[in-house]
Amino acid sequence: MATALRAADKPVRVGVVGVGERGSGHVKMLLDIPGVEIPAICDINTNRLDAALTAVAAAGRPKAEGYSRGPEDYLRLIARSDLDAVITATPWELHTPIAVAAMQAGKYAGTEVPAATTLDQCWQLVNTSEQTGVPCMLLENDCYGAGALMALNLVEQGILGEIVHCEGGYEHDIRSGILRNGDLSWRARESVRRNGDLYPTHPVGPIAWWTNINRGDRFDYLVSMASKSRGRNHYIRKYFGENHPNSNVKFALGDVVTTTIRSVDGVTVVLSHDTSLPRPQSDSGDSKIPLMVIRLQGTEGIFAGSLDRIYIEGRNGPNSKTHHWQGITPYYEKYGHPLWKALGKNAAGYAHGGEDYLCVQQFIAAVRHKVQTPIDVYDAATWSAISALSEQSIAGRSVPVDFPDFTRGRWQNRRKIAFILE
């Protein structure tokens, strides 16, 4: 009750930049979190901006001001004195500039994924956060899935033993988004000029938490390889015709990109990026991490989140020598993460099984209590850097590429993730 009263007395004031599919979802969630106001919204698409402004008014909140004069009108929004935080859900190339400007203005920065597309941008985020003392949180929702958090709890309790290997893949058929009004979408244009794992943070976020990356261990180096590129052109020709203006566009991005990472402590991680070939979405009613392959292997057992299966040696039935999978559902009662047990009911009904809500709620809680965000700027830089590093590796015929140490040595003594229960 004390927290609720405090939230009501002093609302967290958030500006939102970009209200397309993701940003409009953020607006809805922010309006549903007690003690949050949205004084300002920015988008160059006036139709989307008007819809977001209408949503704020319909929720009975104070009127929000709109900003739509041009691609950099977010600077006027950030300059306002009545904002505590800024959330960006724009195309990727704007994530870093907006987050940097927000931190320089003394406002918490919450950025959609990835936080950066180049190593220089990664360092801009780190340097700005360190210089200003203002947190920057990557809004990586997949870290907050019920399954991902339960796996974290299993790791922290030692149930899976010492972690040796993880696998994760963003395997999501998004070909329907290649064209927008007959032309290449902004995301498709990224695929024209870049060849690497362009969207690594969904799988690597939970994996980094499970393996204490930047908190006792760090990624050392990676090797990446890309398949040939066929899926996007095939899709355009099949559904829009051989004579479509974009049917012969040369896409640099391979259909499947595979990256292997090794940590300083010797943990290996295999990531895949696969978004341009036919595949159904997860249809498992019990799935907690849809659209991804995710696996966590320890010396005592294995968690296969995308299959909703687990095996712990010696705990599977009366014959401990029998090797067989168990469903993960019974494990939630005993090993469900405290964050989900405390706030899971609030998250019910929101996108991606509620993980979107919990992610944004944790950002708001950090702003409200003026503490560090659970996913901090070092995580944002490290996870996002995989894109640029994988591009380097592929361009060099799959040469090993070292990870920068964005923590500058502090990874050895940094505290574990601090969740905020309120």
Where are these regions (language model features)?
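Predominantly a Rossmann-like dinucleotide-binding segment in NAD(P)-dependent oxidoreductases
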Residues: 18, 22, 132-137, 142-251
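C-terminal glycine/acidic-rich active-site capping loop/insertion
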Residues: 231-250, 258, 262-263, 300-375, ...
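ADP-ribose/adenylate-binding Rossmann-like module
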Residues: 105-118
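N-terminal glycine-/serine-/threonine-rich beta1-alpha1-beta2 phosphate-ribose binding loop
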Residues: 1-108, 123-135
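C-terminal capping/lid region of NAD(P)-dependent oxidoreductase domains
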Residues: 134, 161-165, 393-409, 419-422
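Glycine-rich phosphate/pyrophosphate-binding beta-alpha loops
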Residues: 253, 267, 272-290
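Hydrophobic residues in well-ordered beta-strands that form the structural core
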Residues: 88, 111, 136-138, 167, ...
